């Protein structure tokens, strides 16, 4: 069965996936290859709704492949109800990576390489509310929750591989 990594933006899903011996499929990388530009540029030019439509199709394709890989999702994959339904069908194989809000906020604030449109849009207080809303979805879909605040990516990868 395909495992799915879930978690808020900046939690380290892509970083952890680089330490897994299992075959990983990074949805953001797949989407960027498909659209021919960065996700940030696509958001700016076409908006979030257009992006979520593409994200939904990529998630469907990857889940239906059912090839025992690890799907590394983007932080907003839980926004669409259809995506949440797809993820519920993957029951017992959804893994949530969790970090404290302050850890995530500092990571995103200092990440000059990957400017995330939804992070740049909010004040810290509004971003916290956004974070709390998303966490409700993640927690409702997750079968294994891994706190990453005080773990290395290698340690997190070992937990995932043992699951």
UniProtKB/Swiss-Prot annotation:
Disulfide bonds: none annotated. InterPro entries: P-loop_NTPase (IPR027417), Shikimate/glucono_kinase (IPR031322), Shikimate_kinase/TSH1 (IPR000623). Monomer. It is found in: Cytoplasm. It catalyses: shikimate + ATP = 3-phosphoshikimate + ADP + H(+). Its cofactor is Mg(2+). It comes from the Bacteria. It is an enzyme of class 2 (transferase). Substrate binds at residues 28, 52, 75, 134. GO terms for biological process: amino acid biosynthetic process; aromatic amino acid family biosynthetic process; chorismate biosynthetic process. SUPFAM superfamilies: P-loop containing nucleoside triphosphate hydrolases. One of its GO terms (cellular component) is cytosol. ATP binds at residues 10-15, 116, 151. Pathway: Metabolic intermediate biosynthesis; chorismate biosynthesis; chorismate from D-erythrose 4-phosphate and phosphoenolpyruvate: step 5/7. Pfam families: SKI. Belongs to the shikimate kinase family. This is Shikimate kinase. Its EC number is 2.7.1.71. Keywords: Amino-acid biosynthesis, Aromatic amino acid biosynthesis, ATP-binding, Cytoplasm, Kinase, Magnesium, Metal-binding, Nucleotide-binding, Transferase. GO terms for molecular function: ATP binding; magnesium ion binding; shikimate kinase activity. Mg(2+) binds at residue 14. Binds 1 Mg(2+) ion per subunit. Catalyzes the specific phosphorylation of the 3-hydroxyl group of shikimic acid using ATP as a cosubstrate.
């Amino acid at each position: 069965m395909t495992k799915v990594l879930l978690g808020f933006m900046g939690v380290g899903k892509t970083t952890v996936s680089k330490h897994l011996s299992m075959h990983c499929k990074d949805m953001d990388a797949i989407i960027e290859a498909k659209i021919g530009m960065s996700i940030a540029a696509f958001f700016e030019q076409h908006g979030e709704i257009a992006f979520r439509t593409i994200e939904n199709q990529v998630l469907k394709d990857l889940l239906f492949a059912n090839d025992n890989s690890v799907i590394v999702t983007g932080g907003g994959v839980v926004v669409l109800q259809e995506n949440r339904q797809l993820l519920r069908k993957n029951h017992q194989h959804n893994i949530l990576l969790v970090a404290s809000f302050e850890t995530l906020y500092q990571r995103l604030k200092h990440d000059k390489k990957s400017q995330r449109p939804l992070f740049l849009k909010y004040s810290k207080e509004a971003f916290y509310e956004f974070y709390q809303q998303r966490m409700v979805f993640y927690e409702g879909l997750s079968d294994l929750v891994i706190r990453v605040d005080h773990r290395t990516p290698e340690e997190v990868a070992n937990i995932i591989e043992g699951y």
